[in-house]
Amino acid sequence: MSTFQKFIQYYKPYKKVFIFDLICAAFISLVDLAYPQILRSLTKTLFLKDASMILKTLPIIGGILFICYIFQAFCKYYVSCQGHIMGAQMERDMRRKLFDHYENLSFSYYDQHNTGQMMSRLVSDLFDISEAAHHGPENLFISLVKIVGSFIFLFIIQWKLAIILLAIVLLMIFFSAKQNRKMQATFLDNRRKIGDVNASLQDSLAGIRIVQSFANEDIEREKFRVGNEAFLDSKRDNYRAMGSFQSGNTFFQGMMYLVTLLAGGYFIALGQMSAADLAMYALYIGIFISPIQILVELTEMIQKGMSGFIRYQSVIDIESEITDSVDAVNMKHPDGDICYHDVSFSYEDNEIVLNHIDFTIKSGKSIALVGPSGGGKTTICSLLPRFYDITDGLITIGGQNIKDIKLESLRNSIGIVQQDVYLFGGSVKENIAYGNPDATFDEIVEAAKKANIHDFIMTLPNGYDTFVGERGTRLSGGQKQRISIARVFLKNPPILILDEATSALDNESEQHIQKSLDALSENRTTITIAHRLSTIQNADEILVIDGQTIKERGTHEELIASGGLYAKYYHMM
């Protein structure tokens, strides 16, 4: 399916509105085309009769035209109002589809793309698409009706002159097609550059505390200046192409007026055309050129819209790597044993991260992963909820292959507490309720109490309704961590992943958080990643991950006694 065919698919839900919009556009054009012809007919017939006949007939003609102009005004309102609403609805549909698609894309996509570019597609590109979606077909239809209609009348009045004008129009079309290709290339480049600017801006503002703490404002300004200048250079190329396009078309339009004047005068001199016909010709030339000017402006709009749509469609066409299998079902035994059978994993660059990993976690038991950074600990945890799919091997929960489990069911059964806590820019209550959007307020409070954060929340100005700031900037690291723990308490999953949940906290905060984590882990199958070995000594089993594989396994006491890597790490504390 071509890009154009994909684009027109979005008109289907609004087919009736779209068709009536075009009918109204046609009526608007036909009324404008009719007036010069009526005036020409009156000049050659009625106005040559006696005064009584003129005075008797004019009110009838005037009344008919008055009714036509009333209907034309109604049509203009419909086109201007409902047509724009249709465009806005299409923009909404595309934005919703794009956002839904973003939500379904796997982690690997986000590993390779930045937020600024994604925001540019959601906002700037879709606005241009919306403008083209409404104004494009409507203005194109009006313009074509006027151009074809006026040319027919020009041909009827003086066909020789019409043929000369047609030659100029064909030259104009050839010139426009050539310039269009240049314009589309510059518009696409322009969209990429504004995406880069948005990405740079988003990155700098999101990290403003780091920027200011290192006094690196000048570095960020320079990075932004480079991107901004690149955008300006792209705009210059864009406007040069547009300038050539518009100036060339203006020249051809001027040639039409000049040819009409010279050739029209020549045909009058030969007696092949009357002065009245030349006057009508001038009126129709105005009607003929006006839509050409609209088409010139419309070309720019359509090029912007189609450039935006190409970028939009480039994302929509990306298939998520992680999807439900055709026969996927809900998880049958969420409290069953978790087994990694000969699991291997590598990223797209084929760098091996895990190499033939085997281990089992009994239901309700805990396992801890330790080892150097980059050894694959976080990857092991990311494979369980299928943030990434394994390259080889098998992972089962309760004997059920996780690839045969619906993603929603799988992920609803797993709670994750991470080192880098993300809080949304809402209230404390909303952030805790993210673990279970259907929870009652009493259930939210109970989860907060279990996470040892309730008393602190009650000291806030608005309690649970207090705004936490973007990414929770108004809260300390320990406070954010306890809210994230409350969120998981509310979710109440049978499986728990603790990914270095206390590594970024001070000792006092760690002690408070560890109590909350111990309570959270009770009676749940738990996987813990930790650098601080003091937090995992009570784990039922500890795995030492190094060199993409399991080097050691056992309890804390067994590993200390063996004197291997774990004992070495422990004595370095």
List each model region and its residues.
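Transmembrane helices of ABC transporter permease
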Residues: 13, 17-27, 65-68, 135-189, ...
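Transmembrane helix-loop-helix hairpins at lipid-water interfaces of multipass membrane proteins
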Residues: 18-75, 155-160, 271-275
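Helix-loop-helix
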Residues: 48, 54, 63, 153-167, ...
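An intracellular "coupling" helix at the cytosolic face of ABC transporter transmembrane type-1 domains
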Residues: 16, 107-108, 124-133, 137, ...
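Short intracellular "coupling" helices and adjacent cytoplasmic loop segments at the cytosolic face
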Residues: 88, 96-126, 199-223, 227, ...
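Hydrophobic alpha-helical transmembrane bundles that constitute the permease/transmembrane domains
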Residues: 22, 26-37, 66-77, 129-132, ...
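Juxtamembrane loop-to-helix connectors within ABC transporter transmembrane domains
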Residues: 2, 11, 79, 83-87, ...
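ABC-type nucleotide-binding domain
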Residues: 324, 331-573
